[in-house]
Design a protein with these regions (language model features):
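Active-site clefts of carbohydrate-active enzymes
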Residues: 203-215, 376-415
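Glycoside hydrolase catalytic-domain groove-lining segments
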Residues: 301-316, 322-400
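Aromatic-rich peripheral "rim/lid" segments of glycoside hydrolase catalytic domains that contact
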Residues: 268-272, 434-484
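Active-site-adjacent substrate/metal-binding segments within catalytic domains
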Residues: 36-39, 43-183, 198-245, 297-300, ...
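Substrate-binding cleft of secreted/luminal carbohydrate-active enzymes
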Residues: 247, 385, 400-453
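Polysaccharide-binding and catalytic clefts of secreted carbohydrate-active enzymes
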Residues: 113, 211-219, 239-341
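Aromatic- and acidic-residue-enriched segments that line the glycan-binding/catalytic groove
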Residues: 176-213, 244, 251-287, 441-456
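Conserved, mostly hydrophobic/aromatic
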Residues: 115, 249, 318, 353, ...
């Protein structure tokens, strides 16, 4: 569909093909009793061709009873936020020159370097595509890094995205150059690292039991905490320390603290070397309990011990080099984000708990998200989520954790639906869409997928952009609506 997003002070109109909603019902799962008229959206966890779709009730702003968007133009949005996309109308907080977290009236917030309340809305993987058409389009549209990043910053900010997340490989330093040259229009950074594999290679260790599934067991190996100290004090972090445009950092990605089919305690006990430190830790834990058989409760407790040893070393190392640098955790995914022991450990040492949130059509407001608030008492950031359109994409879409949906229209509705749920959560301080640009070519072992805000010609997807913009522009107003 043709979507034209008006600029300046011209209001954008809803597209004519907006789905017809059902009758008004109470939105669920929710902590509130807000009414809405649901639209039906098809989705699937399978790769195409999709033989069976699930249909989910979906909430979009257009059909929320009792809510009308406060901000309808780019001009109005730009007048309501600062250069970070933070609110200039909500109560000002102490300005420290850095990002920090604060709980106000039961809701967690980020506070930006200027003291403005900030909801994080960014995109991961801001980097140049490697396919031949990526390269041709980049050269045609930009030609220089400076033009690429200044154009990208402007276009993203004009739909309410103001920064970057993990996996901006080769781009972080370019972003910092852009930020230095354009102090009034920065892109925030939230770089990701791979502490465990780096520790392993620098120490010439093998993975416990020879399996990277057991990478977390490296925290029991000699020198883990000391290595964290030296790594954070070294060249890998030098550029990020004391940079006001750095939101924070993630030290690893999706550590396997357990999965549905594989408990960490079972795995460590199965290591066939009785001298392996991970085995010794697991055996010592079982001996201390006086038991022979692993239970889910014991596994949860042990996973928490492993996670605490991991997070404690990283956080203490951070405090030695830059005590104002926010530690965003390890992008928890799958089973680990539902494990009380892991979440309690993360809450003890992380400033923000990053979560890659997949396999749920709606945020779990009354269950998992409430648990995170109770267990961790720290805010969470959704560090990955997306859907991929499989019927109007030129990619094979044979990879990726995000749901398949039919077209770009459903991607747009899914964005609003999921983020509206996140805005209801008083412990959520924002989200990072995965990702900046579609896969292409040989990405994901030649299984590229439609994940991007941008297509492979560096053009924003119009329908997704329209609905993301409406939500992002009104995010602060929506928080007031949900909190009233």
């Amino acid at each position: 569909p043709d979507i034209v997003m008006s600029g300046g002070d011209v209001e954008s109109e809803y597209p004519e093909d907006l789905p017809v909603p059902g009758a008004s019902v109470v939105y669920a799962p929710s902590l509130n009793a807000n009414m809405y008229r649901p639209i039906s959206v098809k989705y699937s966890s399978a790769y195409p061709p999709i033989s069976s779709w699930t249909t989910g009730n979906t909430r979009i702003i257009a059909y929320m009873d009792g809510y009308k968007p406060a901000i309808k133009t780019l001009k109005a949005y730009q007048e309501s936020v600062n250069k970070y996309g933070s609110s200039t109308t909500l109560p000002k907080q102490a300005a420290t020159g850095r990002f920090y977290t604060k709980k106000i009236d039961g809701r967690w917030w980020l506070v930006d370097p200027e003291g403005c309340l900030h909801l994080e809305r960014s995109a991961t993987s801001l980097r140049k595509g490697t396919s031949s058409r990526n390269k041709a389009a980049w050269n045609s549209r930009f030609g220089t890094d400076e033009k690429w990043l200044s154009t990208t910053q402007r276009e993203l900010s004009e739909i309410g995205f103001h920064g970057t997340g993990a996996f901006c490989t080769g781009t972080y330093s370019l972003i910092q150059i852009h930020n230095a040259s354009n102090p009034g229009s920065p892109l925030t950074l939230a770089p990701s690292f791979a502490f465990l594999s780096q520790f392993k290679s620098e120490k010439s260790y093998n993975y416990p039991g020879g399996s990277d599934d057991n990478a977390a067991g490296l925290v029991f190996y000699n020198g883990w905490a000391e290595w964290c100290d030296s790594y954070l004090a070294g060249s890998a972090f030098a550029d990020y320390l004391r940079d006001p445009n750095v939101l924070g950092f993630c030290s690893d990605n999706e550590i396997n603290f357990s999965s549905n089919s594989s408990r960490i305690l079972d795995r460590f006990l199965a290591i066939n070397s009785s001298n392996d430190p991970a085995y010794v830790a697991a055996k010592g834990f079982m001996d201390s309990k006086g038991v022979q058989s692993v239970t889910d409760a014991l596994n949860n407790e042990f996973a928490g011990i492993v996670a605490e040893k991991y997070y404690k070393a990283v956080k203490e190392a951070v405090m030695k080099v830059d005590d104002k640098l926010l530690y965003l955790g390890t992008r928890l995914h799958g089973t680990p984000k539902y494990m009380e022991g892991v979440m309690r450990a993360a809450g003890k040492y992380c400033d923000v708990i990053s979560i890659n949130y997949y396999s749920r059509w709606s945020p779990e407001l009354t269950t998992a998200i409430a648990d995170w608030a109770s267990w961790a008492d720290k805010p969470f950031l959704v560090s990955e989520f997306y859907t991929k359109g499989v019927e109007d994409s030129d990619l094979n879409n044979q990879s990726g954790a995000g749901y398949s949906v039919p077209t770009q229209n459903e991607r747009a509705y899914a964005y609003q639906h999921f983020t509206l749920g996140l805005l209801e959560a008083k412990n959520c301080i924002g989200w990072h869409w995965f990702k900046y640009q579609d896969d292409d070519g040989t990405d994901n072992s030649s299984k590229p997928a439609n994940k991007g805000l941008y297509d492979n010609s560096y053009q924003l997807f119009p329908y997704l952009s329209f609905f993301a913009r409406e939500l992002n522009f009104n995010a602060y107003d929506l928080i007031q609506y949900f909190d009233k």
